[in-house]
Structure formats: C-alpha cells, structure tokens
Amino acid sequence: MEAIVYTFLLVGTLGIIFFAIFFREPPRIAK
C-alpha cells in the first residue's frame, strides 16, 4: 500500500509542477 501512496504523491507533484510551468509559459506551437 505504501508504494501506491508514494507513487500517487510523486505523480501528483510532477503533474502540479508541469501544469504550473505550462500555464505560466504557454508553449508557442508553430502551425
């Protein structure tokens, strides 16, 4: 059970950091 909890926390932290950077500096996609 602990492995699941640690994995959930790790994914959640990475997700928050990713979305924070993504919304702070939106990537400019060349069409």
Curated annotation (Swiss-Prot):
Quaternary context: PSII is composed of 1 copy each of membrane proteins PsbA, PsbB, PsbC, PsbD, PsbE, PsbF, PsbH, PsbI, PsbJ, PsbK, PsbL, PsbM, PsbT, PsbY, PsbZ, Psb30/Ycf12, at least 3 peripheral proteins of the oxygen-evolving complex and a large number of cofactors. It forms dimeric complexes.
Stored PANTHER family: PHOTOSYSTEM II REACTION CENTER PROTEIN T, PTHR36411
GO biological process: photosynthesis
GO cellular component assignments: chloroplast thylakoid membrane; photosystem II reaction center
Annotated transmembrane regions: 3-23
Membrane topology field: Single-pass membrane protein
Cell location: Plastid, Chloroplast thylakoid membrane
Keyword flag Transmembrane helix: yes
Family per record: Belongs to the PsbT family.
Gene label: psbT
Functional summary from the UniProt entry: Found at the monomer-monomer interface of the photosystem II (PS II) dimer, plays a role in assembly and dimerization of PSII. PSII is a light-driven water plastoquinone oxidoreductase, using light energy to abstract electrons from H(2)O, generating a proton gradient subsequently used for ATP formation.
Keywords: Chloroplast, Membrane, Photosynthesis, Photosystem II, Plastid, Thylakoid, Transmembrane, Transmembrane helix
Chloroplast as UniProt keyword: yes
Domain of life: Eukaryota
Name of the protein: Photosystem II reaction center protein T
InterPro entries: PSII_PsbT, PSII_PsbT_sf
